[in-house]
Amino acid sequence: MNTHAKRISRRTILRGLGVSLSLPWLEVMGPLSAWAESADPKTVAPNRMAFLYVPNGKHMPDWTPQQEGKDFKLSPILEPLADVKNKLMVLSGLTADKARPYGDGGGGHARAMAAYLTGVHPNKTDGTDIRNGVSVDQAAAARVGDRTRLPSLEIGTEHGAMAGNCDSGYSCVYTSTMSWRSATQPLPKEVNPKIVFERLFGSGDKAQAQRNARRRSILDYVREDSKGLERNLSTNDVRKLDEYFSSIRDIELRMDRAEKLPPVKVPDYLPPAGIPASYEEYIRLMCDLVVLAFQADVTRIATFVLANEASNKPYPFIGVSDGHHDVSHHGGDAAKQEKIRKINLFHTSQLAYLLKRMDEAKEGDGTLLDHAMIAYGSGIHDGNAHNHEDLPVLLAGGGCGTLSPGRHLRFEKETPLNNLWVSMLDRMDIDVEKLGDSSGKLPGLL
């Protein structure tokens, strides 16, 4: 180990048979500011953004904090976030206006997801003449995507169709796709963690297939490269690299277990090989892949659909054997509302897992969460009413010092949700005049 090591490029990659392994930031790479390649000299690390979507709205009385500002108390649904409360903002009053009918009748679920990141009213069709708008993640990818191996990462836990009627005459693509590269080009999400892993770290050639057949760790194939690298690293860098490799190996072992275990039989759901039988483990495995992707700077932009809009997935492992969509239409029934609360609480617990994992990943004088913006929410306020104002939305992370978290902010009624997205783009040094129905930037985020 060398305490006076010669600097290495931030683009250093460890290579082996079918493997191309990017590295996290190390001291030997020089200042984080150089790694960030930012136009802002105050930026100390690359800023990342991720968008997590949950369907069917929330039980809002248990979502919205009663107090505003820094002295707010976490509501019952938000209680799992207690450990990272000072690193998130609950944002009330935001509206997805373009998810409203505008004369198109039913289809509130399809419009909710389609308009969530675009701020555009989707064309009502169950055919091929789909039309929406560019989503915020792809607006960002178009500007900074060439700085990383993958321009963006789109993942989820439920497959989606590119055609067919899934909601009152709206194409299934609208209920299952959050990312849109253009008005007519939706980006389907990947739901198999093994394939996501290979996208992040594989080379996509015949050697990769050979490595898969031998069922060895990717770390086995970069061992020689890593040994040569470690000889020039400080003690801190060696420890950080070891933690990074341990995270990769943990994910590999979890994927292997998922392939070997028999699937749990749930009505209308049979997970394919490589997908954990436990839904919680499935989500957390995907979360860990996002953390690795951001750590290694494989991408700086991610979307994660925890379940498709109008998903009727049951949650028997938390005592809810009814379908999610079914109980979201509670009609004021207290028993159904309690089931919705349980599902909402489960989803928030998974968000807490992601945020804590990011906050544990040290990066310079801060953490990965300090150098990111993680938006979480739904395009529906209350699943029983199918309304799209005052949405359940929160924003976590420090945005490289451009956000002042630890608060509950309430904005004026009908404030466009896309004003938040434009504000996030601004913090990525991406200036856009307008995105969808945006009317400006959100005040008070810093």
Q: Where in this protein do the model-derived segments appear?
A:
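Ligand-binding pockets and gating/stacking loops
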Residues: 1-446
